[in-house]
Amino acid sequence: MVPQTETKAGAGFKAGVKDYRLTYYTPDYVVRDTDILAAFRMTPQLGVPPEECGAAVAAESSTGTWTTVWTDGLTSLDRYKGRCYDIEPVPGEDNQYIAYVAYPIDLFEEGSVTNMFTSIVGNVFGFKALRALRLEDLRIPPAYVKTFVGPPHGIQVERDKLNKYGRGLLGCTIKPKLGLSAKNYGRAVYECLRGGLDFTKDDENVNSQPFMRWRDRFLFVAEAIYKAQAETGEVKGHYLNATAGTCEEMMKRAVCAKELGVPIIMHDYLTGGFTANTSLAIYCRDNGLLLHIHRAMHAVIDRQRNHGIHFRVLAKALRMSGGDHLHSGTVVGKLEGEREVTLGFVDLMRDDYVEKDRSRGIYFTQDWCSMPGVMPVASGGIHVWHMPALVEIFGDDACLQFGGGTLGHPWGNAPGAAANRVALEACTQARNEGRDLAREGGDVIRSACKWSPELAAACEVWKEIKFEFDTIDKL
């Protein structure tokens, strides 16, 4: 039997557990241009110093583990470790801090949102020393941005494909979201597009259920698109949801959409996953399809103020993974969304360069290096009376999506679409003439009603509908 040898301290290894602060809390660190920066809102367990928690976040999301290990000596931890370089208390909150962590770019695989998130928002969110942890923002350095393909086409190319300029785009989610046959579904699509909408949409739950298999839906919808285009002389589209149980099935549906000649398909990027989304985005770029992205499941991740991931991070991740549209909330509808916060991440979706602005929740300056922008989609509980606010908030580069606000019109689907189109064009013209939509929007809509009986009927139906609930996630 070989006798056990004693480990000498001079050999460079000492077993045991040491404070994360000794290695991963580095307040003197000078951030590099190539570092990925993260801002975490952390709530330590009672009695745990914030410096220890910040260091633990940096360690557990990069090179650290709970004890000293032999193999630390086989690499350069100083080169690869994450560093908590600053901690600041959250104003007005007890025992909450913003911890800033810098990650060397070499920790992440090029062009992989999946790998980036696996590290930064992985096991660390279950760490016992933390009562709660939320990723508020990420700074993606240009060196890493350039490894991503990004949106298949972007806002300008989409406008060129559609030949639609100078106004926002109009959409509608077909309702009821589940239960229609494929033929009746196609009929609703046709009526909405003929009435004046640019797009109609599959609901995020619509995949290939027994009442309507995907191939039947695709065929009837394609027929509706071509018929509406022939009658109106405008390019029309429908977001055909290609999301499926496997990537192979998803790609089969995308190929079918391409063969039918439709302009746009759709994916549920959070439930479908970033790997599937990036694969689909690359296919769409190579084959001339626009890609509409729905954010189903986002509120499970982003709605709680103290724990999870803020939507601005999910929006940045989608821009890197690839998508031409992304649902972003409405500010004025039925879904969660504070105005300044929403406008902050809308700018992060659309603009090429966004300055740090804590008043809008933007913790870092972000340079997208000419990566195409993503068009925000405002959807959820909106109707014609919201149109002035939507035009004022989002401007032209947005898709305004009225589901119930189209299909709930008392005269039917086509009149509902016409009402929305008249309201949009009236508000756009009023804005272009210098009128203040925030103050005069109601007058603009009432004036347009004189020339559009469809709009007048819609205004009468929804004149008392409001969604006045306080926003949970505030700055």
Swiss-Prot record:
Show which residues form the site (Transition state stabilizer).
K334
Which major enzyme category is it?
lyase
Q: What is the lineage of its organism?
A: Eukaryota, Viridiplantae, Chlorophyta, core chlorophytes, Chlorophyceae
Q: How is it modified after translation?
A: The disulfide bond which can form between Cys-247 in the large chain dimeric partners within the hexadecamer appears to be associated with oxidative stress and protein turnover. The disulfide bond reported in 1IR2 may be the result of oxidation during crystallization.
Q: What miscellaneous comment appears in this entry?
A: The basic functional RuBisCO is composed of a large chain homodimer in a 'head-to-tail' conformation. In form I RuBisCO this homodimer is arranged in a barrel-like tetramer with the small subunits forming a tetrameric 'cap' on each end of the 'barrel'.
Give the UniProt record's GO annotations in the biological process aspect.
Answer: photorespiration; reductive pentose-phosphate cycle
Function field: RuBisCO catalyzes two reactions: the carboxylation of D-ribulose 1,5-bisphosphate, the primary event in carbon dioxide fixation, as well as the oxidative fragmentation of the pentose substrate in the photorespiration process. Both reactions occur simultaneously and in competition at the same active site.
Q: Where in this protein does the record say N-acetylproline is found? A: P3
What's this protein's family per the entry? Belongs to the RuBisCO large chain family. Type I subfamily.
Q: Which cofactor does it need?
A: Mg(2+)
Species, as recorded? Chlamydomonas reinhardtii (Chlamydomonas smithii)
Q: Which residues cross the membrane?
A: none
Q: Which residues carry this modification: S-methylcysteine?
A: C256, C369
HAMAP family per UniProt: RuBisCO_L_type1
Q: Where does substrate bind?
A: N123, T173, K177, R295, H327, S379
Q: What is this protein called?
A: Ribulose bisphosphate carboxylase large chain
Q: State which residues form the propeptide.
A: 1-2
